[in-house]
Amino acid sequence: MNSSIFLDTPVFFHCIEHDRFGTILEHANNAGFKIHTSISVLGEASTQMHEGRDAVRYITHLHQLLDDWNITVLFPNEHVRVLCYQMGEEEIDTRMIREPTDRTHLAYAMAYHSDYFLTSDKNLIKYRIPRSFGGIGFFKPTTMSLETFRDNVLNKTS
């Protein structure tokens, strides 16, 4: 399996809070999916975890998940920069106009050509990227929840 999955911030919270969600990604890892996230997702997740109750447990578990699932952490590159800028300049979908962090996470997934973007954010799932991106070789990954990924992708490859 050469497909790649990008994990958004809420996915880490779901996996820490509910074992059944972590099991989905464990199966994906075992099936050969490459699992990625970005330094921006980790920064957002770490900050939110640090500000919440039981911060040490959450942050420790987050780092354990990175190791357990062999998650590759993506860093900014020229494509991320261009995509972030273009999403701000060519906004066609007002659902995300006040969500630069979410657009940044999506830009990472697109810049690194992830096949799937996993999130629980319904606006991000429905978000439409600027049409011009296709002309420069970037496409929105198939964006879905963990459960939808399990039902529509993972269960069909097992």
Label every PLM stretch briefly:
Residues M1-I39, Q48-H61:
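Short, well-structured N-terminal submotif of metal-dependent ribonuclease cores
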Residues V41-V80:
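Short, surface-exposed acidic-centric catalytic microdomains
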